[in-house]
């Protein structure tokens, strides 16, 4: 994030607002009720732009999310994930679309940092950005109407990490 200033965080219920635009890339992370692709529903899609602004899109049951879907399938915008495999599979399962193009910081780390013992997001943030991640404040009830104590800073680090590779 530029200048160490706090990002603007916007909660978007049901879909990403049509007025929100991304230029070249968007950092993406998903939160679910669990890790079973078939059983556990997608609750939240976090997006961060190149300026560090964060959009928390709460996914409501039965909602179509046309703006979010358009963003995730836009071939001109790179979607940055850390360990994209689960997120991409869950988006396909719940929203019925294939996310493309994708940049995975975990795969990039494995390719570029072959001697590193860890490729976790926490390790990457510390090694590349000098930032220590603390997920203690992260909520686990992603299906709640009101998200409490959510630590949104994590998603903001994917954009600058991509620039390091």
Regions found by a protein language model. Name each.
Residues 1-26, 30:
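N-terminal accessory regions of nucleic-acid-interacting proteins
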Residues 27, 36, 44-48:
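Non-catalytic, usually N-terminal nucleic-acid engagement modules in DNA/RNA processing proteins
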Residues 33:
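Conserved Rossmann-like nucleotide-cofactor binding loop
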Residues 9-11, 25-29, 40, 61-63, ...:
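Short amphipathic alpha-helical surface micro-motifs
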């Amino acid at each position: 994030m530029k200048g160490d200033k706090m990002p603007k965080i916007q909660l978007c219920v049901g879909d990403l607002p049509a007025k929100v635009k991304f230029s070249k890339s968007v950092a993406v992370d998903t939160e679910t009720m669990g890790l079973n692709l078939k059983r556990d529903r997608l609750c939240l899609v976090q997006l961060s732009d190149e300026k560090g602004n964060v959009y928390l899109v709460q996914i409501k049951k039965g909602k179509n999310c046309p703006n979010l879907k358009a963003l995730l399938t836009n071939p001109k915008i790179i979607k940055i994930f850390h360990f994209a495999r689960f997120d991409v599979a869950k988006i396909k399962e719940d929203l019925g679309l294939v996310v493309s193009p994708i940049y995975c910081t975990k795969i990039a780390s494995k390719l570029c940092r072959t001697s590193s013992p860890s490729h976790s997001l926490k390790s990457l943030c510390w090694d590349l950005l000098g930032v220590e991640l603390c997920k203690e404040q992260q909520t686990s009830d992603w299906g709640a109407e009101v998200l409490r104590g959510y630590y949104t800073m994590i998603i903001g680090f994917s954009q600058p990490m991509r620039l390091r590779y």
